[in-house]
Amino acid sequence: MNKEVFATKTAIILGDRDGIPGQAIEACIKTTGAHVAFSTTECFVUTSAGAMDLENQKRIKALADEFGAENIIVILGGAEAEASGLACETVTTGDPTFAGPLAGVQLGLSCYHVVEDAIKEAVDPAVYEEQIGMMEMVLDVDAIKAEMQQYREEPVEA
């Protein structure tokens, strides 16, 4: 993904207290020219059954309605592959726990983890290294990439 793609996107950032915080992701994403509409840092593993925070689901749905799903990109900072995958599933095919506003709602949003190559290559390398480089060394980046790819490859039913 290149910077030109980001210039037309509205970013929703879901950082993780135990992974990469929203503020660090936001600093990176701002170097791409994307408009950051919402940025937060949550505890992915603290929420019940790994479900996305209900208020965040509500906010994401409202932003998708406001800007159009095709104009949104969700960037995650989860420490664990499985938790990141659940968040990705929630914003693409709907809340798998059926607990929140996105239960049964297939937004089909583009969703990436900040350590994925598509994001890393679009971000200013110096800012990425400063904000994320240290955490990248302790995360299981390969597992995160594989999990995220799996959810992007699942078809979203209309």
From Swiss-Prot:
Keyword Repeat part of the UniProt annotation: no
Catalysed reactions, as listed in the record: acetyl phosphate + [thioredoxin]-disulfide + NH4(+) + H2O = [thioredoxin]-dithiol + glycine + phosphate + H(+); acetyl phosphate + methylamine + [thioredoxin]-disulfide + H2O = sarcosine + [thioredoxin]-dithiol + phosphate + H(+); acetyl phosphate + trimethylamine + [thioredoxin]-disulfide + H2O = glycine betaine + [thioredoxin]-dithiol + phosphate + H(+)
UniProt-listed InterPro entries: GRDA
Pfam families: GRDA
Domain of life: Bacteria
GO cellular component, one term: glycine reductase complex
The protein's Enzyme Commission number: 1.21.4.2, 1.21.4.3, 1.21.4.4
GO MF annotations in UniProt: betaine reductase activity; glycine reductase activity; sarcosine reductase activity
Alphabetically ordered keywords of this record: Oxidoreductase, Selenocysteine
Active-site residues annotated for this sequence: U46
Subunit details: Monomer. Component of the glycine, sarcosine and betaine reductase complexes, together with components B and C.
Family: Belongs to the GrdA family.
Alphabetical list of NCBIfam families matching this protein: reduct_selen_A
Cited function: In the first step of glycine, betaine and sarcosine reductases, the substrate is bound to component PB via a Schiff base intermediate. Then the PB-activated substrate is nucleophilically attacked by the selenol anion of component PA to transform it to a carboxymethylated selenoether and the respective amine. By action of component PC, acetyl phosphate is formed, leaving component PA in its oxidized state. Finally component PA becomes reduced by the thioredoxin system to start a new catalytic cycle of reductive deamination.
The protein's name: Glycine/sarcosine/betaine reductase complex component A1
Name of the gene this protein is made from: grdA1
